[in-house]
Amino acid sequence: MERMDLSLYVITDEKLLEGKDIYSCIEQAISGGATVIQYRAKNKSSKKMYEEAVVIKKVCRKYDIPFIVNDRIDIAIAVDADGVHLGQDDLDVEVARRILGFEKIIGLSTKKIEDVIKANSLPVDYIGFGSVFPTSTKEDAVYAGLEKLKEVMKISVQPVVAIGGINEKNLTDLLKTGCRNVAVVSAVFKDDNIKENTERLKNIMENFT
């Protein structure tokens, strides 16, 4: 698969987007500089997830941005998403690869150095590592810190996307580790200024030296 731009990886949040126009929210994030969109919903019916995924895929296709579905391979297949992102307790990566083939993207969450080492021999396109900072969007997240991220950057053979509590205030410190790919949730969808929030993150990344 052609290497994709993982630099500003935006993940949806069902609580933050509750009652809002999903198409408009995703379009604003993309207009602000998002390079990947991941749809994550843990507490919705399959029917509702399918309906929302169809909408998100439509806007991602309009702007030629990769669309990833969190966990649910069935939803990803149903809407012909570009790929899936799996957690450590989700479907085995090698099984997912057999189902999806090598044209689709598979990402894998990692929390520990051991997870990263194991992922090196798995058929994944990138890994997510974190939580790098304390986060409010995942209650069970383990805080890893920047020193661990530095280790991961040296060990991983796949592109690394840092995740967890990343915002305008700590992004520069994160970039100093050498990591150039970040996943964000609240930093983008915390209020109605989605495009502006995304633009500020993008500007920090582009101006970092």
UniProtKB/Swiss-Prot annotation:
Swiss-Prot/TrEMBL keywords: Magnesium, Metal-binding, Thiamine biosynthesis, Transferase
EC assignment: 2.5.1.3
Cofactor annotation remark: Binds 1 Mg(2+) ion per subunit.
A GO biological-process term: thiamine biosynthetic process
GO annotations of cellular component type: cytoplasm
Catalyses which reaction(s): 2-[(2R,5Z)-2-carboxy-4-methylthiazol-5(2H)-ylidene]ethyl phosphate + 4-amino-2-methyl-5-(diphosphooxymethyl)pyrimidine + 2 H(+) = thiamine phosphate + CO2 + diphosphate; 2-(2-carboxy-4-methylthiazol-5-yl)ethyl phosphate + 4-amino-2-methyl-5-(diphosphooxymethyl)pyrimidine + 2 H(+) = thiamine phosphate + CO2 + diphosphate; 4-methyl-5-(2-phosphooxyethyl)-thiazole + 4-amino-2-methyl-5-(diphosphooxymethyl)pyrimidine + H(+) = thiamine phosphate + diphosphate
Sites where the protein binds Mg(2+): 71, 90
Binding site for 2-[(2R,5Z)-2-carboxy-4-methylthiazol-5(2H)-ylidene]ethyl phosphate: 135-137, 165, 185-186
Protein family according to the UniProt entry: Belongs to the thiamine-phosphate synthase family.
PANTHER family attached to this UniProt entry: THIAMINE BIOSYNTHETIC BIFUNCTIONAL ENZYME, THIAMINE-PHOSPHATE PYROPHOSPHORYLASE
Name of the protein this chain belongs to: Thiamine-phosphate synthase
Encoding gene, per UniProt annotation: thiE
